Amino acid sequence: ELMKITLVMFLAAYYDWLPAKRVSRPFWVLLPIVIICIPTALVLQQPDLGTSILLLAAGGGLMFLAGVHWAYFAAVIGSGVAVITAVFQSRGESWQLLNDYQYRRIDTFLDPAADPLGAGYHITQSKIALGSGGWTGRGFMQGTQSRLNFLPEKHTDFIFTTLAEEFGFVGAISLLGLYALIIVFCVVTAIRNKDRFSSLLTLGIALNFFLFFAVNMAMVMGLAPVVGVPLPLVSYGGSAMVVLLQAFGLVQSAHVHRPR
């Protein structure tokens, strides 16, 4: 959890120090890539594929916002396609790149109905709960899927499903609206801030925040594989909450102490 904010702080400080004319030169692009890959590799060893991918995305996104030329990202995307191809080709081989449970998650994402009582149980129950909420929901503490324990992990990764079942489409959109207000505040703070470090730091925190809630919501709706990413400010978990509040404290500091 600490690495999410530490990585953003390092990249913001790096690009604040680096002259703008050097931002896209190969040598100066390589260093932040190495710094991003080190914690990503450590998280991947846990193994936590979802968080490691989001660290890469957040780091790469901040590099783009700092002004790194788009050609580097085109090369990364091309390499990513090659890696994904290798991942699928390695399945069942002695050198397979993912664990068996990670391949099962991909299979479940592509066809959850193939094993509705096994690997596809989580996402199947999640979709049932989302659909049963309707426009206004079943009412607080009245959700059948979540309260009768049909829905696993309802207090952590799948808490958005519980909210949508009990408060319906209106409740889900209201939460999205609150998230959007936070993102807008961060972006406006970054735009108005003349200090490059504070601006990049605020944008990096906003990007991290967006990626985690977007992936969580996509995951519980079946639009992305189940990767164990919590819903910011809502899911159960002390360390994630503390780190996120620290990040928002930095945003507030950037807003209050911005050069006039």
Where are these regions (language model features)?
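Extracytosolic (periplasmic/ER-lumenal) interhelical loops and adjacent juxtamembrane/interface segments
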Residues: 113-141
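A juxtamembrane structural motif centered on a specific transmembrane helix
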Residues: 215-260
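Short hydrophobic, aromatic-rich alpha-helical segments embedded in or entering the lipid bilayer
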Residues: 104-107, 121-128, 154-158
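Glycine/serine-rich anion-binding loops at beta->alpha junctions
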Residues: 1-3, 45-47, 51, 134, ...
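Long extracytoplasmic/lumenal interhelical loops at the membrane interface
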Residues: 130, 134-170, 197
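Hydrophobic alpha-helical transmembrane segments of multi-pass inner membrane proteins, especially
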Residues: 1-119, 161-222, 246, 250
